[in-house]
Amino acid sequence: MSVNYKSVIAMVDDALNLVEIVEEHPCPNGSEWVIYQYQRTSPLILSAWREGNKHHFVTKIGKEKLNLVPSLSAAGIEEVYIENNRVHIVYAGLAGGGVGAELRKGAKNVLEVNILEKGGGSRLGKAEVITPKMEKVIIGIDDTDTKEEGATWVLAHEIGLEVEKEGLGYYLDHTIVQLYPGNPNKTQNCVSIALSFAVYPEYKYKLDKFIKKLLKERSLSDETAMAVYYGLFPSKSMKLFALKAKKEMVKIEEAKSIALRNNIKIIPINGEGGIIGAVAALGLAEHHSLAPKLCEDIKL
């Protein structure tokens, strides 16, 4: 078949014993069926969502037998385990739901696909997909422009592309976070940026050095700063700080306190003015519907 998944990425959080799987489906909205069926069928899956034709699954590490029923629970993930820095994902499904596992062969970042049972027609299909073990790193960036020129969101996106080009990992996401519009120190719209990456473990602590260098070279502001968070999910305290930074002025000391509590690395590039926005961006990096909103439009 010529229809293949474009990429499969598996990020592991060893402390939580969880894996986030991100797959780029070959069809524009075909991933909606996958999200619905996999979540209904798979006890291993804790949460699932779609962004365009990419689907995300957060799974436990382990094995759970699937109770496959046509139409009702037609396909899912049966097993996820880590071995020799590789993530093994076992998919199973009925009819077309079983063929999908085979179509991950040839996808970017997939090392190997082992067909366990050949699917198609009315048959059960089962396959094991193997990817490198990766980890998630989220970078908050703020204050790179001036009132005369520049745009932080554009520079951040360029940096994301440079990271992928350099081979350090995959550029997953770019989130624009609206902050307090009444800030007298703002350039104009008062936003900061969160960039999310899937990174190979050996590059985990090299990523920030690479981004720091690019910001130092390209930032136009004297107050540029970045913040680095290692993990799948920003904490509740990080989210609450970000929401507060939407509502009112906050002090740098509060941002530093949140960073200390959550093992966030703060890196001033040209100054400390951007620390608040950089830390705040991390808290809403995974909350795409909340991130761009003004405080008065958020109902929690």
Curated annotation (Swiss-Prot):
Alphabetized InterPro entries for the sequence: Methan_mark_11 (IPR017674), TiaS-like_TCKD (IPR053870)
Domain of life, per lineage: Archaea
Protein name, UniProt field: Uncharacterized protein MJ0921
Entry coiled-coil feature ranges: none
Pfam families: TiaS_TCKD
UniProt-listed PANTHER family: DUF1743 DOMAIN-CONTAINING PROTEIN (PTHR40705:SF2), TRNA(ILE2) 2-AGMATINYLCYTIDINE SYNTHETASE TIAS (PTHR40705)
Origin organism lineage: Archaea, Methanobacteriati, Methanobacteriota, Methanomada group, Methanococci
Signal peptide bounds: none
